[in-house]
Amino acid sequence: MLYAFTLGRKLRGEEPSYPEKGGKGGADKSAKYAAEAQKYAADLQNQQFNTIMNNLKPFTPLADKYIGSLEGLSSLEGQGQALNNYYNSQQYQDLAGQARYQNLAAAEATGGLGSTATSNQLSAIAPTLGQQWLSGQMNNYQNLANIGLGALQGQANAGQTYANNMSQISQQSAALAAANANRPSAMQSAIGGGASGAIAGAGLAKLIGSSTPWGAAIGGGIGLLGSLF
């Protein structure tokens, strides 16, 4: 009679036709797919992080270089040295010569040669050109320093984002390791739950890879977390 009831339940689909040996096969596949998804996510984070860092790397030295240049121009001594170099440059000689010619031509046209006004205009050429050059240099240094500072800030932001995302991945990987450790399996029967957790954690750490120092550190952390379960 019991057999008849059992057969009826199987025919109605209330029970499987053949008893399953357990969910080990499906669970193993699920764990494998989950680990592959974690690896893909970690690899993607590594690629994005490395791309950003490498793209910004050429610009980061500008910050140190041109902040130092600005510091040099912030003192009277530094400004004096810079202006002295400028006054001895061909650029200054050309601009000063052009300015003198224009002033003298205008004074000659108006009959003002030898006047105090003309003399004052000629004497103002050097300090005017010097201050214009110095102001332009400081603006250029500031702009270049800002480019470097922006690159450094971009790297810092990328590092923070990378750390946050990899922290989430490591937590998910640790949860996966815990689930694998707590799931009955042939491996656990053989070596025990604690050792299984350690193996799972070490495997996930390997999946993370070490394409960046961050990835290596987080991968090591995943192995440590996995060994706790």
From Swiss-Prot:
Keyword Hydrolase: no
Superkingdom of source: Viruses
Compartment(s): Virion
Segments forming a coiled coil: none
Keyword Kinase: no
One of the record's GO cellular component terms: virion component
Maturation-removed propeptide residues: 1-20
Primary location: virion
UniProt entry keywords in alphabetical sequence: Late protein, Viral genome ejection through host cell envelope, Viral penetration into host cytoplasm, Virion, Virus entry into host cell
Described purpose of this protein according to its UniProt entry: Inner capsid protein that plays a role in viral DNA ejection into the host cell. Assembles into an extracellular trans-envelope channel completed by the internal virion proteins gp7 and probably gp16. This channel allows the delivery of the viral genome into the cell cytoplasm. Displays membrane-association properties, may therefore form a simple channel spanning the outer membrane.
Protein family membership: Belongs to the podoviruses gp7 family.
Protein name, per record: Internal virion protein gp7
Organism encoding this protein: Salmonella phage P22 (Bacteriophage P22)
